[in-house]
Regions:
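SAM-dependent transferase fold signal centered on methyltransferase-like domains
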Residues: 1-382
Length: 382
């Protein structure tokens, strides 16, 4: 296996040369995905912005995330790098020496859940636990929750985005116990479905969770949670579990405590997603601190990702797609800037959704959005 030194952030990693050449990178003999660098950039920034000095990279591979935290977050005292692949751990250990952080790292050859459950106990838990599997994280959630300290941070990634975005709804119901939506705000629904799954798993252990950062790409959805131990905290989390309803006929979206069959506006059959998280996905102060970390570390893409989330929770848990709305009206696509300007002129706030390629979030109801877009379309035709 030919190895190369690959620099990511301020950290030198030992990775197979083929991992930098093949797309997708091979999973054997060890796995490293260079395309996930943004995921790890954001992770470093959020970790640096929060309190705590112990970190568990529970699916470490060649050690990219754990080594970056050990190297780039100065207050970190102990980082556990866990993997079942002996060859991957050997590379992680060699890279730890290369970066001068081997003394603060511990290496464990173990299956993820077994290791995480072994860390249950007041003095054995971690301030940060990261779960980043290939596919669904559901099988690791209970162990990860038990291994995270009270007021610690649990970060969870899901890479089965086609499942979470509604391409395979039966698989989503089996894995996540929830129904997704395959529509223009499917990625936000995917984020909320993952958050809801984590909240329900935590509640079964009398633990609450509070999302502080959430982001997504075409390949993954990822949520950082503050862990809050206690039955009352669990009950508070469950109060943010609900359902989203979307009407394919008229485009109306609503949130409910339970499923609804018919659209409230047109009365036709609606589509439901859930149970999922309908509460806030971010905390502004955490985002601001993480953004400052990204700026100070010269990580422009991470800074852009974090900045795009500011203000997202001022709006309902869905978005409107401009192309979809214009198509529904039978008009040419109206410029995004004109829609924002028109909404603000009549007293509404709006922003680009950070979860989809296109789309806007607004506090205006959908009929008013349709009215504005229609008027702009007529004006453009003259």
């Amino acid at each position: 296996m030919k190895l190369v030194v690959h620099v990511e952030g301020r950290t030198r990693l030992l990775v197979p040369a083929v991992s930098l050449e093949a797309d997708p990178p091979p999973t054997s003999p060890v796995f490293f995905n260079p395309a996930a660098s943004l995921n790890r950039d954001v992770s470093v920034c959020v970790t640096a912005a929060a309190d705590g000095s112990t970190f568990c990279d529970s699916m470490t591979g060649v050690g990219a995330r754990g080594l970056r935290v050990a190297k780039e977050v100065s207050r970190m005292e102990r980082v556990a790098l866990v993997d079942f692949n002996s060859e991957a751990l050997k590379l992680a250990r060699r890279a730890a020496r290369l970066n001068g952080v081997v003394r603060k790292c511990e290496f464990a050859k173990s299956e993820t859940s077994s290791y995480l459950y072994s860390r249950y106990g007041r003095d054995r838990r971690f301030d940060f636990v990261d779960v980043d599997p290939f596919g669904t994280p559901v099988g690791q959630l209970q162990g990860a929750i038990s291994a995270t300290t009270d007021e610690g941070v649990l970060s969870v990634t899901a890479t089965d985005t086609a499942v979470l975005c509604g391409v395979y709804p039966k698989v989503a119901r089996r894995r996540y116990g929830a129904t997704p939506l395959n529509n223009h705000f499917g990625h936000e629904t995917a984020v909320r479905l993952l958050a809801g799954t984590v909240a329900r798993a935590a509640a079964s252990a009398d633990t609450g969770v509070r999302p502080v950062v959430a982001h997504s790409t075409r390949h993954y959805v990822r949520v950082f949670f503050k862990i809050e131990v206690g039955a009352r905290k669990a009950d508070a989390s469950l109060s943010s579990i609900g359902h989203l309803t979307w009407c394919p006929s008229c485009g109306e979206s609503t949130a409910h405590a339970s499923q609804t069959i018919s659209c409230e506006r047109c009365g036709k059959k609606a589509r439901n997603a859930g149970p999922l998280w309908v509460g806030p996905l971010t905390e502004t102060e955490v985002l601001r601190r993480a953004r400052r970390e990204a700026e100070g570390r010269d990580l422009p893409k991470a800074c852009e990702t974090i900045t795009a989330l500011l203000g997202v929770d001022d709006f309902p848990p869905w978005s409107f797609d401009i192309d979809e709305t214009c198509s529904r009206l039978g008009i040419a696509t109206v410029p995004e800037s004109e829609i924002y300007r028109s909404l603000k002129e009549v007293g509404h706030a709006a922003m680009r959704t950070p979860f989809e390629k296109t789309g806007l979030k607004t506090d205006a109801e959908y009929p008013e959005v349709v009215k504005i877009v229609s008027a702009l379309g007529r004006a453009a035709r003259g």
